[in-house]
Amino acid sequence: MKGYHLRLFWILLLLGITIPRAAYAQGSMAAAQPHLDKAKAAAWRPADGLNDLTHLYEVVCAPALSPKGPGEPPDQAPPPLSERKVPPRADWYQEPAKVFDNLYWLGSWGTASRIPPNPGGDSTWAVTTSEGIILIDSGYDYSAPVLIGEGLKKLGLDPAQIKYVVLSHAHGDRYFGSRYIQDAYHAHIIMSEKDWDVLAKSDEPNEIKPKKDMIATDGMKLTLGDTTLTLYLTPGHTPGTISTLVPLKDGNQRHVGAVWGGINPSLVRYRVKYFANWEETFKSWSASTVRFQEIAAKAGADTYLTIHPFYDNALEKIHLLQYRKSGDPHPFVSKDNLNRFLTIIKECTDAQLARITAQPQSTKLNQ
């Protein structure tokens, strides 16, 4: 009998642990489901591949859909430059492209285009003005001389005319190339104060960190010649993520582009903790999304431009521009797509928040 009671004790103990966890998982998924449904509805356009945002939904909502719930891989220090494996040019190179009369794409594509490798590549946007060029992000140190320096020349532009680089946030895929641009072309580097602080604390290689320069503030107007960009602080991906409104020209038509400065919310990267906990992270990112959506609507924004080309189907749209005839709609222009994009970001974030704040359901075993 003693052995039986011992076995029963361990069975009840195990049940006492596992059943509340199962109840928590079920309860938290139930709390998240309305947000997941809204995100999926915003993404799903099966009959229109160009405007279908299912891939965005699958990536951004993945943590909320996971049985383990929200979280991210253990933080790891980046390798020193001497140990880093730079992918061959053929694995990331893409031809530069003109997207609007005053906007150019200078990005990468491919599984090995990022360090660590990540499918889809990175976007750098070049805004031309009457007095020079403004870049939004810079890609990697190994790719910037090719994609930006050589790319602008291929488009008939002079990289020496780069006057400013707006860095959306302090992650390597945004800023590693900026030190090259700062040194080669004497361009000003702009980032939020909080992300300059992140950069200073980060374990990423100091050799490719830009020298601290201009500080972006919320609502800041960046004017160069005949063009003014407006920068907004939208924390959540990093403490000081920047999202940008860009005036666009398409013949006689005028549009407003919205560059959302991140994708997934982040808590820590390269030994730098961004927020106190996940709840604060999710609340910050969700609030930023709502605010920027309102700002974009008030500004008449009708074009969404992302920092990774697979989230806005940039290459497919660029391909269509080759066949566009006078009077045809511009494939990048769509207020609906902009709103759907931001809705997916918000609802996937809210789904993660719902999962971590849901209360465990009571069971007889843990009463």
Label each residue range with its predicted role.
Residues 9-21:
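Bacterial N-terminal signal peptides
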Residues 102, 127, 137, 169, ...:
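Divalent metal-coordination and catalytic microenvironments
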Residues 89-155, 243-266, 270:
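Conserved beta-strand hairpin/beta-sheet module of binuclear metal-dependent hydrolase folds
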Residues 83, 92-93, 98-101, 146, ...:
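Metallo-beta-lactamase
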Residues 26-86, 90, 251-254, 265-367:
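Accessory terminal helices/loops
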Residues 37-41, 142-146, 150-221, 319-328, ...:
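Active-site HxH/HxHxD metal-binding segment of metal-dependent hydrolases
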Residues 143, 170-176, 196-199, 239-242, ...:
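Active-site environment of divalent metal-dependent phosphoester hydrolases
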Residues 1-6:
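N-terminal secretory signal peptides that target proteins for export/translocation
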